[in-house]
Design a protein with these regions (language model features):
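ATP/NTP phosphate-donor binding region
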Residues: 1-60, 67, 71-78, 99, ...
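Catalytic core of DAGKc-family lipid kinases
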Residues: 5-8, 34-36, 75-185
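Structural motif
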Residues: 60-61, 85
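Short, contiguous clusters of charged residues that form electrostatic/catalytic patches at enzyme active sites
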Residues: 64-67, 113
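Short active-site-adjacent helix-start/loop capping segments
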Residues: 66-69, 91-93
């Protein structure tokens, strides 16, 4: 029997993340599962040092959870087998892999190494499928604000439409890729 650490985001899928992560018990019937609420992990270095190198890690959440994990665990070599179980509301990364929510966890070690880095106002972040700036970042920020005020599900389509019509203002960007600079206004 192997040990699998299930890192889950309880806020994913409009607050259904815990419930969806618990479905892994049906997939991993013969394994010992240790559930860890990602929002309560204060440092991934300590977490990774505390687990066996043979233990699997299963990351449960959506695209935001995946990007947050990648940045919060920056510097970790991802030597443990690392899997992704999409429990978000969008799951674009999962769809990029040709999968859908509810499929068995997919190994992602190869996808989380050597990721692109974006630096904005002196803060650098890695990203796997989205940067979190522009209209995407605006929608996530507004969604977080609404989540703090209410338990109702977040409608990101409505946020995007209202943002594009009334509130969101695009910013200029200078991007360096492989030593070449590109400007966007």
């Amino acid at each position: 029997m192997s040990v699998k650490y299930i890192l889950y985001n309880p806020l994913s899928c409009n607050g259904k993340g815990t419930e969806l992560a618990k479905k892994l018990a049906e997939i991993y019937k013969d394994d010992e599962l240790k559930y860890c609420n990602m929002t309560q992990i204060s440092g991934y270095g300590t977490f990774f040092d505390s687990i066996s190198p043979e233990s699997d890690i299963v990351l449960c959440g959506g695209d935001g959870t995946l990007n947050r994990f990648i940045n919060d665990s920056d510097g970790y070599p991802y030597e443990n087998p690392l899997y992704y179980y999409g429990t978000g509301s969008g799951n674009d990364f999962l769809r990029d892999l040709g999968m859908e929510q509810g499929c068995e966890p997919v190994r992602i070690n190869e996808y989380v190494r050597n990721l692109p880095i974006v630096t904005v106002n002196g803060k650098s972040s890695r990203f796997i499928n989205a940067i979190g700036y522009g209209i995407d970042g605006y929608c996530c920020e507004k969604g977080d604000e609404l989540r703090e005020k209410s338990d109702k599900p977040i409608n990101y389509t409505s946020i995007a439409v209202k943002g594009l019509l009334f509130h969101f203002r695009p910013a200029n960007a200078v991007i360096n890729v492989d030593g070449r600079e590109y400007s966007y206004k």
